[in-house]
Amino acid sequence: MKILFAFLATLFLASPAWAVDVMMGANGNLVFEPAEVTIAAGESVHFVNNMLPPHNVVVEDHPEISHEGLAMMPGEEFDVTFAEAGDYTYWCGPHKGAGMIGTVHVE
């Protein structure tokens, strides 16, 4: 029983702190994948640069949670935490005109 508890505790502690992964530049395209996600209030979205840079995340009307610094290297990653319920539109600053836009629904 102690071994099972230790194993389960290790799995729980090793779990990521975010709710969902979003790839920036998925499959070589200027998109967020998935472009629309739903999370609970207080959870984070984990953004991963999946192609050549630069990419960032600008959250409309919420500069306090935006990650405007550019992710310059493939594999670079960061989290954005959404504390309050609502719908949040975000985009990549350099590629918004190309349609690199997404939405986070926070329940």
Per-segment meaning from a language model:
Residues A17-E107:
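Extracytoplasmic copper-binding redox domains, predominantly the cupredoxin/blue-copper superfamily
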Residues A6-F7, A17:
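Cleavable N-terminal signal peptides
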Residues M1-F5:
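Positively charged n-region of N-terminal signal peptides that target proteins for export
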